Amino acid sequence: MSKLSQPATTPGVNGISVIHTQAHASGLQQVPQLVPAGPGGGGKAVPPSKQSKKSSPMDRNSDEYRQRRERNNMAVKKSRLKSKQKAQDTLQRVNQLKEENERLEAKIKLLTKELSVLKDLFLEHAHSLADNVQPISTETTATNSDNPGQ
């Protein structure tokens, strides 16, 4: 059985160190690990492919730079238009909801008045029925029960 050797640390860029280890005797290959170089972890570990793009500044007169700027400007313009449209849609929805709220409040007032009128009619009718009903006395009931045929 073979043992792994001690990992070798290579100083990297952007505060990142790359740890290399030797492969097993079986021929398995290990992938280098990206770790922060400092004890504070001074940044995110970035793969080398991403690091190379950041390290070389682009010439402002190059075609690639102009194309990137143009694409970025178009994206910003599109984003701002989308944001404006969303704000307009929201404002329109707010106005629709306000109008609907006013209609509903008017309907509530109308229905409340109608309920009040109906309650008054009901109470008036109930009182008139109560006034028309004569109290039944015990004498009348006794007389009617003695003469069931009449």
UniProtKB/Swiss-Prot annotation:
Residues 66-93 are annotated as: Basic motif. It is found in: Nucleus. Keywords: Activator, DNA-binding, Isopeptide bond, Nucleus, Transcription, Transcription regulation, Ubl conjugation. InterPro entries: bZIP (IPR004827), bZIP_sf (IPR046347), C/EBP (IPR031106). Pfam families: bZIP_2. Ubiquitous. GO terms for molecular function: DNA binding; DNA-binding transcription factor binding; RNA polymerase II cis-regulatory region sequence-specific DNA binding; sequence-specific DNA binding. SUPFAM superfamilies: Leucine zipper domain. GO terms for biological process: B cell differentiation; chromatin remodeling; DNA-templated transcription; enucleate erythrocyte differentiation; immune response; liver development; mRNA metabolic process; natural killer cell mediated cytotoxicity. Residues 56-72 have a biased composition (Basic and acidic residues). Residues 27-94, 129-150 are annotated as: Disordered. Residues 134-150 have a biased composition (Polar residues). There is a cross-link at K3 (Glycyl lysine isopeptide (Lys-Gly) (interchain with G-Cter in SUMO2)). The keyword Transcription applies. Signal peptide: none annotated. Residues 28-37 have a biased composition (Low complexity). Residues 62-125 form the bZIP domain. Transcription factor that binds to the promoter and the enhancer regions of target genes. Binds to the promoter and the enhancer of the immunoglobulin heavy chain. Binds to GPE1, a cis-acting element in the G-CSF gene promoter. Binds to the enhancer element PRE-I (positive regulatory element-I) of the IL-4 gene. Binds to the promoter and the enhancer of the alpha-1-fetoprotein gene. This is CCAAT/enhancer-binding protein gamma. The gene is Cebpg.
